[in-house]
A protein has these predicted regions:
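Secondary-structure transition/capping residues
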Residues: 16, 74, 201-202
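Alpha-helix termination/capping residues and helix-transition junctions
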Residues: 16, 38, 100-103
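C-terminal/domain-edge helix-coil "capping" segments
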Residues: 22-42, 51, 140-203
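Charged, low-complexity, helix/coiled-coil-prone segments
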Residues: 31-46, 124-137
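N-terminal segment of the mature soluble domain
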Residues: 43, 47-116
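Conserved protein kinase catalytic domain
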Residues: 64, 124-125, 191
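Surface-exposed short loop/turn segments
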Residues: 88-157, 161
Length: 203
């Protein structure tokens, strides 16, 4: 898939090919610092790594909203550290922001990769003319092939003072049908696991 088609997540249009329905999001791996388990953070700076300015805002704003709903203070880096597209955040700018807003943790999300796999429906064994009829029908109707898209993201939570990793997780979204679905599902999965490990304060 071309880079301009992927951007941060994935935007795919298939002509005459069935895109399989949404498959949902799950955390495939997680890691927690045992010393920090059940020691919740209180205020998070949210950073999404992407060249696309609108996607950065969208992801971070949704993450901040969900964290606040979960009972924790949070701020979007896009709101407090504005940068141009394709420009990286400088460490000094991040430190200035966490000091100004008194964040005790930083959470960073980036894309690991996008996998696209075409699934071909195999012809049943019906003899040569049965095969012809089956193939003819599927050639003239959608559904002969399908494309499975898998989007993988990684999210890390760091302690501001020590800069040590508190929690990390890798997510996998199978057959996403929109960018918003990926964003919403990943955020929900991450927050749920942080709550399970009592890294977020009780509401």
């Amino acid at each position: 898939m071309r880079n301009d088609a992927i951007k941060w997540f994935v935007c795919v249009v298939f002509s005459g090919v069935l895109l399989v329905a949404c498959g949902g999001t799950k955390l495939t791996t997680t890691q927690v610092d045992d010393a920090r388990r059940e020691k919740p953070v209180s205020d998070i700076l949210v950073i999404a790594i992407t060249y696309e300015k609108e996607l950065r805002h969208s992801f971070e704003d949704k993450f901040v909203e969900q964290l606040k709903t979960a009972g924790i203070e949070a701020v979007s880096s896009a709101d407090v550290i504005p940068i141009s597209e394709k420009q990286q955040l400088e460490k000094d700018a991040i430190l200035k922001a966490v000091n100004e807003f008194e964040n005790d943790a930083v959470i960073i999300t980036h894309m690991v990769g996008v996998e696209e796999k075409e699934i071909i429906t195999r012809a049943p064994s019906r003899g040569y003319y049965g095969h012809y009829l089956w193939a003819y029908g599927n050639t003239h109707e959608p559904g002969y092939s399908s494309t499975r898209i898998t989007v993988r993201l990684a999210t890390n939570l760091y302690d501001v003072k020590t800069e040590k990793l508190i929690w990390s997780g890798k997510s996998e979204t199978l057959r996403p049908d929109s960018i918003n679905q990926i964003i919403d599902d990943v955020i929900k999965a991450v927050i749920k696991d942080l709550q399970k490990n009592k890294l977020l304060p009780p509401k």
